[in-house]
Amino acid sequence: MSDDVKAQHSEFRDSIDNIDAALVHLLAERFKITQKVGHFKAEHTLPPADKNREAAQVAHLRELAEASDLDPDFAERILNFIIAEVIKNHEQIKDET
C-alpha cells in the first residue's frame, strides 16, 4: 500500500472515530434528558411508555433518514433499540419511586 493510500485510509478512519465519539456524546445527552423525563413520569404517575409518541418519533426519523440517504429501516432499528432502553430505564425509575 502506498503512502498516499495509507494516509487517505487513516483520514477516513479518523473521521469515523470523530463521528463515533460525537454519537456517544449525543446519546449520553439524550439519556440524561430521558432520565429527567423518567423521574417526571414517575412523580406524575405517567406510564413509562407512550406508543403514540414512539410512533411519531419513528415516522419522523424515517423521513430524516430518507432525506439523508440513510436506510430508513436501519434508522428505525436503532431508534427502537434506544426507545427500548429508555422504557426500561423509566420502568426502573418508576419501581424505585
Please tell me what each predicted stretch does:
Residues 1-97:
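Domain-level signature for soluble enzymes in the chorismate/prephenate branch of the shikimate pathway
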